[in-house]
Amino acid sequence: RYPDLRVFESDFLRMSPDAVAPGAIAVIGNFPYNISTQIVFKVLEHRDRFTELVGMFQKEVADRLCAPPGSRTYGISSVLAQAWYTMEPLFIVEPTAFIPPPKVRSAVIRMRRNEVTSLACDERVFTALVKAAFNHRRKTLTNALRGFPGLPVVPPKFAALRAERLSVADYVELAQACGPP
């Protein structure tokens, strides 16, 4: 029925996308909760190959990935995932769906790669900037990014804000304000 469908059973963190198939790859899985964030970061690293991911995650991880700016759960993984993928929470899976039931709730989400696969800034600077801002999430960006390479002064419109208040577009704008890496 699905002549183009190929199923690979392997250690996702060790496999090379090139060894799986040429071209676009969609990932579907019930990921081990202890490595699910690493799986997402591998997808982000190879975003030119991974067009979509549908997976079950611990609910807290799914909430973080899908969180909007300004929410308590918005963080590094939210910004980086949303920079290249559209995040869609699909449904929650209660512990009673499993035998034995886990102590945590689960959620299934879909990540669809955006049409624009590159940002309007240096992506290494963007990633480093997001990580630096959230490493001091309770500080204003002026203090959190003090000494960040290429950014002598945080632009005034961001200076008094905290990391969780900025959208992906805001982080792109901040990265553009930085000099070359």
Residue ranges of each PLM-predicted region?
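Short secondary-structure junctions and interdomain/linker hinges
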Residues: R72, R137-T140, P181
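Alpha-helix C-terminal capping segments
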Residues: R1, V20-A21, L145, P152-P156
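Short, locally clustered residues in the helix-turn-helix/winged-helix DNA-binding domain
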Residues: L44, R146, G179
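Catalytic cores of RNA-modifying enzymes
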Residues: R1-L129, E173-Q176
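Short hydrophobic "helix-edge" motifs at membrane interfaces and signal-peptide entry regions
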Residues: D48-R49, P155-A159
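An accessory alpha-helical subdomain
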Residues: A97, S106-R113, S118-L151, F158, ...
